[in-house]
Amino acid sequence: MNMLTEAAVEKALDQKMSNVPYKMIGQDVSVYYGEKRALFDVNLNIRENTVTALIGPSGCGKSTFLRSLNRMNDTIEGCRVAGKITLDGDDIYDPDIDVVELRARVGMVFQKPNPFPKSIYENVSYGPRIHGLAKSKADLDQIVESSLQRAGLWNEVKDRVHESGTGLSGGQQQRLCIARAVAVSPEVILMDEPCSALDPIATAKVEELIHELRENYTIVIVTHSMQQAARVSQRTAMFHLGNLVEENDTDKMFTNPDDPRTQDYIMGRFG
C-alpha cells in the first residue's frame, strides 16, 4: 500500500469515526481524594457503540475516571468530583439524578470476578427483579437465559443454573458478572481490568465477548495490556499523572501517537 492510499484509508476511517455520536461527555473532570487531586481537568468523550480503552501506568487516574462515569467514586469517603459528565446530555452529577438508576444504565464489571454467593440464576435475576423489569416468572426466566447467552455462558451452565455461581471457574465467573450487568439493559458497560485475574484462554473468551457486546452497548475498558487495548478497542485514551495525554483512534495511537509520552509508554520505556 503506497503512502497516498494509506492516507486515504486513514482519512476514511477518521471520517467514519467522527460520525459516531457521543454517548457520554466528560468536561473538565477533576477528582479529589480529600486534599489530594487525582485527576486534572480531563476532557474525554465516549462514542456510542464503541469500545474505548483507557491506558496508562499504575496510579495515572484511568480507573478513577472510569469510576466517575457511574458515580462509583461516591462510595469512597472524602472523594469529590468536579467538572461535568453527561449521559445522553443529562448531567449525571445533578442532585436530582437517581444514582441506582444511573448504575443500571451504566453498568460495571470489576477487576476480580465478584459473583454473589447465590445461584447462577439468582446472580442474573437479582437486578431485573429489583428494577421491576420482569412482570412474571416467565419474563425473568427469559431475561436470565438471554443475558447468559449474551455473555457466552448459557451453553456451559444451562443445566445447572440453580447451582452456586461461586463454583464456576474464574473466567466463567467473570462472564457471569457480565451477564449480571447486561441483565438490567444498560446502555454503557464499564470494565476495570476485567481479564487481569484470568488465564489466556478465559481472556480470549472475554475479549471475543467484548467484540460482540459492542453491537448493543457502549464499552469503556481500563487495561494494563497494550495488546488487549489494541485488540478490543476502536478508541484509546492515554492517562499519565492524572492528566489525559491524548485520545485517538486505536490504530493511530499504537502506530503514530501525537504525544511522545504515549510512544514511550507503549514501547515500555516507563510504566
Swiss-Prot record:
The complex is composed of two ATP-binding proteins (PstB), two transmembrane proteins (PstC and PstA) and a solute-binding protein (PstS). PROSITE patterns: ABC_TRANSPORTER_1 (PS00211), ABC_TRANSPORTER_2 (PS50893), PSTB (PS51238). It is found in: Cell inner membrane. GO terms for cellular component: plasma membrane. Belongs to the ABC transporter superfamily. Phosphate importer (TC 3.A.1.7) family. It is a peripheral membrane protein. SUPFAM superfamilies: P-loop containing nucleoside triphosphate hydrolases (SSF52540). Keywords: ATP-binding, Cell inner membrane, Cell membrane, Membrane, Nucleotide-binding, Phosphate transport, Translocase, Transport. The keyword Transferase does not apply. SMART domains: AAA (SM00382). It is an enzyme of class 7 (translocase). It comes from Rhizobium etli (strain ATCC 51251 / DSM 11541 / JCM 21823 / NBRC 15573 / CFN 42). Its EC number is 7.3.2.1. Pfam families: ABC_tran (PF00005). Residues 24-266 form the ABC transporter domain. Part of the ABC transporter complex PstSACB involved in phosphate import. Responsible for energy coupling to the transport system. This is Phosphate import ATP-binding protein PstB. It catalyses: phosphate(out) + ATP + H2O = ADP + 2 phosphate(in) + H(+). GO terms for biological process: phosphate ion transmembrane transport. ATP binds at residues 56-63. GO terms for molecular function: ATP binding; ATP hydrolysis activity; ATPase-coupled phosphate ion transmembrane transporter activity.
